[in-house]
Regions:
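Conserved GNAT acetyl-CoA-binding A-motif
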Residues: 110-121
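Conserved acetyl-CoA pyrophosphate-binding loop and the N-cap/start of the following alpha-helix
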Residues: 92-105
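Conserved beta-strand in the GNAT
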Residues: 59, 65-74, 83, 88
């Protein structure tokens, strides 16, 4: 998933959380974001491992440093849809394309015209709308991406 001249690498998270995860979690908590802490708790409890059909969890490394993480799970409320989850990009790595590359890579793995939802934090609404999600505040999410129009 890496271009030869691109210092940003995306790697699937399969068996263990990535090296550097504790620093990522500390940054998220310092900003008041709990999604990375929830990811760690769910991972340890084995309740969410991003291993069902259509699911994935990707880590983003820039020059070897864990810059961000993001996943896609089955949407529990909207039939047939998937949900972007546990997205976080460290402050030092924002606005340089890390989040966009995570989203693009996850969407590339989606089969068919499945809709994708996200429950966007207020600070991330502009980002999610910039990658094609539209406001749709219902069923526990804030935005939806209709793959039919992509």
């Amino acid at each position: 998933m890496k271009a030869s001249d691109d210092p940003l690498e995306l790697e699937p998270v399969l068996d263990t959380l990535p090296v550097g995860f504790d620093a990522l979690r500390a940054d998220a908590l310092a900003e008041g974001f709990r999604q990375v802490e929830r990811l760690a708790a769910d991972w340890e409890a084995r309740t969410t491992r991003f291993d069902r059909d259509g699911e994935a969890l990707l880590a983003a490394r820039l020059n070897g440093v864990l810059a961000g993480i993001g996943g896609l799970t089955v949407e529990p409320v909207v039939p047939g849809a998937l949900r972007m989850r546990r997205f976080y990009v460290r402050p030092a790595f924002r606005r340089i394309g890390v989040g966009r590359k995570l989203v693009t890579a996850l969407l590339a793995g989606v089969d068919g015209d499945r809709s994708i939802t996200v429950n966007a934090a207020p600070a991330s609404i502009t980002f999610w709308e910039s990658v094609g999600f539209n406001p749709d505040p219902r069923d526990g999410h804030t935005h939806i991406l209709s793959r039919e129009s992509v």
